[in-house]
A protein has these predicted regions:
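Outer membrane beta-barrel
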Residues: 44-46, 50-56, 62-168, 173-194, ...
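Outer-membrane beta-barrel pore domains
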Residues: 8-15, 19, 35, 54-64, ...
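Short, Lys/Arg-enriched charge-dense amphipathic segments
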Residues: 32-39, 110, 147-152, 282, ...
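N-terminal periplasmic/intermembrane-space "pro-region" immediately following the signal or transit peptide
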Residues: 1-52
Length: 329
């Protein structure tokens, strides 16, 4: 009898639920649509940023202490499209109250990225572009970028204008367009190799630049390097090689890493906006040591020391020093 009573009660409850659902179906549907729309919009915009305090000095030179702050907005347009905008203060010297020493907020990233499935994406606007391993260029680029690939091999084509480094401050008429092709592939479990070609649409001798790069990581050991050249232009080779040890991750307190690199760039090397922190980018050769340490989660200290630098004729160049205190949020 008890089981029959429970069955009857359950049946009556279900019947009541069905009647209420039928009676208020429109209201429930409207509420459901509104809730779904709200859920779709929750978390659509992600805000991140970073701040940096930097100290620079060199032998027989005046030291400089400057700062920079950046805020980035990543907006989810739909499940395949993202829009990104980043504001930056630029580098401003602390203690300099003149107009040129003040922070000047501007947009240095503004682009849309659309995914065509899992292996193809297209980016357009103002974004960061890297050529090869970054020895020649790792900076701001206005144009379009196509990416195709998977976990083992990646091909990238970009067309547009370099607008940072030596290309900063140029008008559109003064600037030139670049067609960049990068190809990178994984070799085994630990190594990546890549090559690039950069076609520069201008009339002088620097029109075709190519290069190769490689990186290998074995647990905490890193070995890597890059070589590049402008074809049909003498004294245009540049290369770097280095070795490092550690597991530095700015997100994890207490992690650290050390690195030593050698750089050699001829007088006409096509270095526009390098990814590295050495101050002599052409007609120079020398060493740079780097130490990274995560003081706290998302707080990192980086120190660089450049030593034994000379020009290509063997004349000494000044040692240089740099320390960055970086904050991520």
């Amino acid at each position: 009898m008890l089981f029959r009573s429970q069955d009857r009660a359950n049946a009556e409850q279900q019947a009541m639920i069905n009647r209420l659902a039928d009676e208020f179906s429109n209201e429930l549907n409207n509420l459901g649509v509104r809730v779904a729309r709200l859920e779709d919009r929750v978390g659509n915009v992600k805000v991140t940023g970073d701040a940096r305090l930097r100290y620079k000095d060199a032998e027989h030179a005046k030291s400089k202490f400057d700062a920079r702050a950046r805020v980035q907005f990543n907006a989810k347009v739909n499940d395949r499209t993202d829009a990104v905008v980043r504001l930056t203060s630029g580098n401003f010297e602390l203690g300099d109250s003149r107009t040129e020493g003040k922070a000047d907020a501007q947009i240095d990233r503004a682009y849309v990225n659309h995914k065509f499935g899992e292996r193809v994406s297209l980016k357009a606007g103002r974004f960061n572009q890297v050529i090869g391993g970054g020895l020649a260029f790792d900076g701001t680029f206005d144009g379009a970028q196509l990416n195709v690939g998977n976990d083992k091999i990646m091909a990238q084509a970009a067309y547009g204008y370099m607008v940072s480094g030596d290309a900063a401050g140029l008008t559109k008429e003064e600037n030139v367009t670049d067609l960049i092709v990068n190809v990178n592939g994984k070799v085994g479990k630990h190594a990546m190799v890549g090559g690039f070609y950069d076609r520069i649409n201008q009339d002088d001798d620097v029109r075709n630049v190519y290069g190769f790069n490689a990186d290998a990581n074995f647990d905490k050991i890193w070995i890597g390097g890059e070589w590049l050249k402008a074809s049909s232009l003498e004294e245009s080779q540049a290369w770097t090689a280095g070795v490092g040890y550690g597991n530095y991750d700015i997100k994890k307190q207490g992690t650290w890493g050390v690195k030593g690199q050698y750089f050699n760039a001829k007088e006409n090397a096509p270095i526009i906006d390098t990814t590295y922190n050495h101050i002599y980018t052409t007609d120079a050769k020398g060493w740079m040591a780097t130490v990274d340490y995560a003081l706290q989660n998302n707080v990192g200290l980086t120190a660089n020391y450049g030593f034994d630098w000379k020009d290509q004729n063997g004349n000494d160049k000044a040692d240089f020093y740099r320390a960055d205190l970086n904050y991520k949020f």
